[in-house]
Amino acid sequence: MSFFFSRQSDISFLLFSESTSTTRNSSQARLLSRLAVDGSKGRAMPVLNTTRATAAASGVDATLTIRDGPVFHGTAFGANSNISGEAVFTTSLVGYPESMTDPSYRGQILVFTQPLIGNYGVPSNQRDEYGLLKYFESPHIQCAGVVVADVAEKYSHWTAVESLSEWCAREGVPVISGVDTRAIVTHLREQGSSLARISIGDEYDADEDEGFIDPGAINLVKRVSTKAPFVVSNPNATFHVALIDCGVKENILRSLVSRGASVTVFPYNYPIHKVADNFDGVFISNGPGDPTHCQETVYNLGRLMETSSVPIMGICLGHQLLALAVGAQTIKLKYGNRAHNIPALDLTTGQCHITSQNHGYAVDASTLPSEFKEYFVNLNDGSNEGMMHKTRPIFSTQFHPEAKGGPMDSSYLFDKYLENVQMYKDNSKVYRDNRPSQLMIDILSKERVGVEPSPLAANAI
């Protein structure tokens, strides 16, 4: 198998062609060398990011202003900067490092209902045997800002290396504490998710609408997706999976690689249908924002299902994009589902799973085409939580079976997906060794390439 690269716009696209030849000309070698250099940046968490870090805003007055809603006064800590975004809330009791680094929260002001946040500090950027972050879901904080009732100034945990305030200041993310989060959540539940702004120091004028940035009007996936392919390899891999990165969490990659798959991660708008037959399966990741912004991805997935019988699985935004690709529609939920304890009913078995969720949009199950059926349903609000093809190895879930944080009730779905992958590989008419060659492992970056950290202040998304 040989690998050829071509550059389209600012994205390096990887194209595969099968060949028994092991010789490569010098010009191709030089191109691969340049790509290797280009792909060596972007994923490693820096010790200090001087472009984002600010002085800690400890003890300074701060204001949370909800557009067309109440104003809450509190105390700032973390970064000394003003931001705006969509105010959403999570009822998760633990897992704030994972939640804050989840790319699905890009552009949002995250309100924690748990009264005390920060008591076990922030862990290190240690990586596992696959080169993936052990304690974070991406290298940087992804939410625009954080709102808590009370913050623990002193922390204690064997993995902790810094406080929540120090971490947020280093990452350039402002936090407001000392506010009534119960009143904030009550407003968001009754009125729906709202645009909001965190102001440090002088109170912000709520009448200045231009100060509120709406992340729903922006293609946030473009901000969090890798700009060039990279590989997460398992030296004993049985499968080779292509993953469409819409803002993939580290634990999704880990859930695949630890089960015997090597994963090649592609940009969200990569024409995956052109190379799908070189892989044993295709996976569509989670991500932030409105799925209708990703029309290129929707088109590519539609073409993929028309031209290939490769097994497909999607999670969260990946579920929504897959639904759009088959002709279904998505809807915006009033205030979304963000928690670690949401019950989802498996309609094929009648079993209930406690699931981890983080989404503001959902698939309208009534619009699913006849060849698909609803897989899971939310027992709290009746919204769709998954779909599956009636005859082909294609399924997706709205919730997160990989958790991080949250329960592992549904982690078996990764096993189900890889069983489909194994069956597809076994049934292939001509056996192909789809494991990545050593050349590919050496050349392709093991980093998420060109992903910009969450900006500051007015550019908070």
Swiss-Prot record:
One of its GO terms (cellular component) is carbamoyl-phosphate synthase complex. The keyword Amino-acid biosynthesis applies. One of its GO terms (biological process) is glutamine metabolic process. Keywords: Amino-acid biosynthesis, Arginine biosynthesis, ATP-binding, Cytoplasm, Glutamine amidotransferase, Ligase, Nucleotide-binding. It is found in: Cytoplasm. Its EC number is 6.3.5.5. The keyword Amino-acid biosynthesis applies. One of its GO terms (molecular function) is ATP binding. PROSITE patterns: GATASE_TYPE_1 (PS51273). The active site is at 316 (nucleophile), 400, 402. It comes from the Eukaryota. Pathway: Amino-acid biosynthesis; L-arginine biosynthesis; carbamoyl phosphate from bicarbonate: step 1/1. CDD domains: GATase1_CPSase. NCBIfam families: CPSaseIIsmall, PRK12838.1. Belongs to the CarA family. Heterodimer composed of 2 chains; the small (or glutamine) chain promotes the hydrolysis of glutamine to ammonia, which is used by the large (or ammonia) chain to synthesize carbamoyl phosphate. Small subunit of the arginine-specific carbamoyl phosphate synthase (CPSase). CPSase catalyzes the formation of carbamoyl phosphate from the ammonia moiety of glutamine, carbonate, and phosphate donated by ATP, constituting the first step of 2 biosynthetic pathways, one leading to arginine and/or urea and the other to pyrimidine nucleotides. The small subunit (glutamine amidotransferase) binds and cleaves glutamine to supply the large subunit with the substrate ammonia. This is Carbamoyl phosphate synthase arginine-specific small chain. It comes from Chaetomium globosum (strain ATCC 6205 / CBS 148.51 / DSM 1962 / NBRC 6347 / NRRL 1970) (Soil fungus).
